[in-house]
Amino acid sequence: MTLEAIRYSTGKLVIIDQLQLPYVEKYIEVPTSKDAWHAIKKMRVRGAPAIAIVAALALASELHTLMAHDKLSNRAEEVRLFIQEKLDYLVSSRPTAVNLSDAARKLAAHVSDHAEMPNSTGRAVAEAFIQAAEEMLAKDLKDNTNIGKYGAEWIIRNALAGGRSKATILTHCNTGSLATSGYGTALGVIRALASKNALAYAYCTETRPYNQGSRLTAYELVHENLPATLVTDSMVAALLAKAEAAVDAIVVGADRVAANGDTANKIGTYALAVLAKFHGVKFLVAAPLTTIDRSTKSGADIVIEERPASEVTTIKGAVETESSCDRIKLETVRIAAEGIHVWNPAFDVTPSALIDAIITERGVVERGTDGRYNFDGIFEDHSAF
C-alpha cells in the first residue's frame, strides 16, 4: 500500500510529519496558511509538488473555516486581496521550488477572474479558490502516474544494455508519495518499472545533510517491499564503477527546471550527473510541467535557498542500544567541531548538457539536434490547473 503524505477532505488538511519519519508515522493538522508556512519552512512537508499542494489546501481549509463561522467578508475584492496576501506569504516559505510560486500565480489569476464577475461575492471567490485547490490535488496524482509510465517506457527503450529486460535505477533525495500527492515523480518511475516487472534493483542515496534518502526514500522502498539498497552520497562513484551493480540510469526529481533545461534539485544532484556522464549512465529528470519555469532562462537565474548550519553540524535520530531501537525517543547530537563555519545550500544546478532527458506528464523531452532543450511543444494547450 502506497504511503499517504497528504490527507484532505473539504475544510480539513492533515499531513504526515516527515520530521518524525522513519521512526514514527504521525499525522498533523494544517488548518491555516500560517500553519502551512511553518510546516513547509521546517520541512515537515517537503518536495516541490507537495509543498504547493499543502499551501493551496491549507488556505482552502482556512477559507472554509472562515465561511463556516461567518467571518469572511462578502465583498469579492476584499476576499481576493486576502487570498493574494496569503499566497504571497506562502511563497516566501521556500523560494527555490517553482511549483509553489506557479500554483500561487495560477490560483491568484483564477480568483481575480471570479472577483471581476458581475455580482460576484466574497463567498463565490472563496469557493472558486477551494475548488481550484482541490483540483490541483487530483491532477497531481494523475500527472505523477503518467510521469512514471513515460519514464519507465523510455528507460526500457533506451537505457537497457545487453538484451536485459529489467533496469537497475539509482535515485536521489525523496521524490515519492511523501514528496507529492501520491505515487511520486522519480520514485514513481521506479514504481512504474516494478509494476511492469521491469525493475531489477533500486539504489537510493542517503542525501546529506538532511538525509531525505535514508529517512524517506528508504522508508518508502521498504514499505512497498521493492528490492533496494541504501548508499551514502560519496559511494555513488564506486557503485557506478562496479560492473556487477550494472546501474542503467539515475533518475532524480526537480525543484525548478529553467527554459534551457538547467535543473535545480537537491544538493548533490549535480555531482551525480557528472558521475553519470563519466560512467556512461543515463541521467534523467522526472518532473511535472509545473516545475518547468520558462521565465527563467538558465540555471544562473535560479535563486538557491540556503539552510541553517545546524542541519550539517547536528543529526537527529532514534536512540539505539545493543538490544533495541527506541522508535519514540528521538535525540539530536552534534557531529561537527564547534565553531566551524558551514555552507549549506539546499539545492544545486545541473547543466542541461548533463541531462539525457526530462520526463513530464505529457511525455519525455530530449535535446534537439542543436543540443538544446525546447519545451514549447509539450506546453501546448497546458491548462491552468
Curated annotation (Swiss-Prot):
Its EC number is 5.3.1.23. InterPro entries: IF-2B-related (IPR000649), IF-M1Pi (IPR005251), IF_2B-like_C (IPR042529), Initiation_fac_2B_a/b/d (IPR011559), M1Pi_N (IPR027363), NagB/RpiA_transferase-like (IPR037171). It is found in: Cytoplasm; Nucleus. GO terms for molecular function: S-methyl-5-thioribose-1-phosphate isomerase activity. GO terms for biological process: L-methionine salvage from methylthioadenosine. Pathway: Amino-acid biosynthesis; L-methionine biosynthesis via salvage pathway; L-methionine from S-methyl-5-thio-alpha-D-ribose 1-phosphate: step 1/6. Transmembrane segments: none annotated. GO terms for cellular component: cytoplasm; nucleus. The record marks C173 as: Transition state stabilizer. Keywords: Amino-acid biosynthesis, Cytoplasm, Isomerase, Methionine biosynthesis, Nucleus. It comes from the Eukaryota. It catalyses: 5-(methylsulfanyl)-alpha-D-ribose 1-phosphate = 5-(methylsulfanyl)-D-ribulose 1-phosphate. NCBIfam families: eIF-2B_rel, PRK05720.1, salvage_mtnA. Catalyzes the interconversion of methylthioribose-1-phosphate (MTR-1-P) into methylthioribulose-1-phosphate (MTRu-1-P). Belongs to the eIF-2B alpha/beta/delta subunits family. MtnA subfamily. This is Methylthioribose-1-phosphate isomerase. It comes from Aspergillus clavatus (strain ATCC 1007 / CBS 513.65 / DSM 816 / NCTC 3887 / NRRL 1 / QM 1276 / 107). The gene is mri1.
